[in-house]
């Protein structure tokens, strides 16, 4: 789990640096691979869609965002299925894992800790538990899409100068930036449904980094990028709720584990109050 968190944090920080620190002139014509095969096709597609919606580039960006999300939806569903499968295995292995973790806390020497950690790895192997199997591919795929959106908007005077609702697509908008951040914060809480309190604590930092990064970047990036995030986040939240409903019905042991964790936390809280 720690290795996966490091990978995700690296990806998010990479996106932050790229979107806030790139110095390439977006108006400059380039014949590079990224420009030729990603930026220019994105720009052309947005303009193509805009022709069918009365030249409204805001609606064109929304449609493009939904199409992108629909295209990567099978990959997201596969990832969600893997996550639910991992949660199911963790629920079954939980009694053994809890017992080993308790002994690990009582261990007094490094040799004893190493021996107990080997036992933990044996349990993981026994139940075929590997958090890295859940993967980060959906997030990695979105990186070039974000960059293409960014430069397509800044490189097109038609898109950059277009006003949609109350904001200009080519300029930052604080209200939309906050909306995009809140949408992804809500999406994070939706994604935590079904996880045990202990797992939620482990994933809290990486989970909150995404909305914080989106909020930070949206304050300085073209508002069209915040629009992409807001629409994409709403789509992703709905998709997550759907997959949770579908897969959690197939893995009732996850609900049992979550209920047991909640009951345990309530007992701990009551004991603290009594003291």
From Swiss-Prot:
Lipidated sites in chain (S-diacylglycerol cysteine): 22
Keyword Secreted: no
Subcellular location: Cell membrane
Pfam families given in the database record: 60KD_IMP
Position of the signal peptide: 1-21
Residues passing through the membrane, by range: 48-68, 133-153, 174-194, 212-232
Covalently lipidated residues, kind N-palmitoyl cysteine: 22
Purpose: Required for the insertion and/or proper folding and/or complex formation of integral membrane proteins into the membrane. Involved in integration of membrane proteins that insert both dependently and independently of the Sec translocase complex, as well as at least some lipoproteins.
Protein's recorded name: Membrane protein insertase YidC 1
Biological source species: Listeria monocytogenes serovar 1/2a (strain ATCC BAA-679 / EGD-e)
């Amino acid at each position: 789990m720690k290795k996966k968190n490091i990978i995700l944090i690296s990806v998010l920080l990479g996106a932050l640096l790229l979107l806030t620190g790139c110095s390439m002139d977006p108006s400059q014509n380039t014949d590079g691979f990224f420009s030729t095969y990603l930026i220019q096709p994105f720009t052309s597609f947005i303009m193509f869609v805009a022709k069918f919606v009365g030249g409204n580039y805001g609606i064109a960006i929304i449609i493009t965002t939904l199409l992108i999300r629909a295209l990567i939806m099978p990959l997201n569903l596969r990832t969600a299925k893997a996550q639910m499968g991992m949660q199911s295995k963790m629920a079954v292995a939980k009694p053994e894992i809890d017992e080993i973790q308790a002994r690990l806390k009582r261990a007094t020497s490094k040799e004893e800790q190493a021996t107990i950690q080997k036992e933990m790895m044996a349990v993981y192997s026994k139940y075929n538990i590997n958090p890295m199997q859940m993967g980060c591919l959906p997030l990695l795929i979105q990186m070039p899409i974000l960059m293409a959106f960014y430069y397509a908007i800044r490189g097109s005077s038609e898109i950059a100068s277009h006003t949609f609702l109350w904001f200009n697509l080519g300029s930052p908008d604080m209200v939309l930036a906050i909306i995009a951040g809140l949408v992804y914060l809500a999406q994070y809480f939706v994604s935590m449904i079904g996880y045990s309190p202990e797992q939620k604590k482990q994933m809290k930092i990486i989970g909150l980094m995404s909305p914080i990064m989106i909020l930070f970047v949206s304050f300085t990036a073209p508002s069209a990028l915040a629009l992409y995030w807001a629409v994409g986040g709403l789509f992703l939240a709905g998709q997550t709720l759907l997959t949770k409903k579908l897969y959690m019905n197939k893995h009732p042991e996850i609900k049992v584990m979550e209920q047991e964790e909640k009951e345990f936390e309530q007992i701990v809280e009551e004991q603290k109050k009594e003291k």
